[in-house]
């Protein structure tokens, strides 16, 4: 009997236009859960070594979470998986919205695509019946137009995942969109979808999702929701920056309590951290060479939390989320009502490029969402091009006449449009900064801020070394949604998992930069826990409530009927981590090549600002982490088998 999971996946052969359902044994869910765990098990053997990420041998998968649809909270995440054309290794992108339960209500835990369609198509699953339909009339349309059309055509109740022009044009920094602005952006998987000439998935199902103890799941959810709804008064948005200033100047630091971050998220969303992050040295500035000195409180005032709150027409909640950190905002630009930009997007298109023009940030964010292009990588690529222009590596002639100086919002908007269309210099930049630098030469690679080919997110590891560790060791490099010292403090896993260290409540800041076994244990615990979360479909923001308040492990047991301990679930997370690492080794990716670049780890250290004088011993931190994973501490290669290989699909 299936419990929590549907027990089946759907294979779609785009070349042959054939469908095949596959039953997944129950013991596989017990070993790897669902979500990216199930996907890692499936794709480990089914994508052959050397497969072209943009070729027919690559597999593109859409997976839901084991807890999605069971009545548990914060379980609306869906994931896209495949071999990444950006990094050459394991690729997955995680997204909110409303698609995740739609996958399961069609009767599947995942939908996987092989081959390449001769012409553009979209997949429609209507009450269990899969069908490939012509998408020629939709090719070239943006994600919002396409989604609106397909929902109307399906009767108004379907959920849609769709690529825009960036994915169609095989941009290596393109993603996959749903709900008009929630995007599975990282790893370049929009290009994989475009290479298969697959425009969209349209899902319309009503299958009941089985739950072992539905009443218990609901009881746990009610208990958890009491913590979510606590919302004491907080300071005005512009004052948050001064809290950051105080945190920066004090020699000591207090361990972060997730309930505080919950208050910020519930009131403002992720933009609550915009100015504060600049002040404490968390938000990178001027392509990672600047600091709060260059983009201080005065310059960043335009992106203070209340600037977004004042435009918010309605809050946006992902499926099963009581927090509602998203929003729909009104703008003065051409798009009218748009999704509120997230922190990552604001800072990538803002401080990273020294741009304080709020209206331009709204405009570029919506342009990129409609095109289906990653705002983090797009912002990182813009900042790279700006520094190349500053250094004389790119000239105004190279940039099609654009005066790409720091903070030139009009030039940024024009360049974003060119990148989306692959027009002029936009064609050079559409695949991200590393690919562009390799074509430019002339030392341009010195200004690419990446790990393993993926532009880095808006969290500076010189402030929190845990970010640099995870940027450098995850199977999907340059990732900020797995772990950091800050995350470990908020997860509070030591309250539920035996043997994990409890950080002190107050500690000297210098303690963060000491590479030792305790830091490695914390980092490995974050990886394992988030692998469990991504197998369950849990949102990281919900997990910040702390392990004693959000019943992740209890939800899993109640939904499935299992009786696993927190330690057993963490072991599952470790097994998933190793599967993904093995995938990279199989596909010729050297784990050493994922190390974040020198500037990002403080080589040389900055001479002013919040992160002045800080350098990470990233090699030791990485080696210590690999040792905690049971891998070779010098090479990052796993040793020994951890699971039987899944069978290859029948021809």
Regions flagged by a language model, labelled:
Residues 1-94, 98-648:
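Intrinsically disordered, low-complexity segments enriched in small residues
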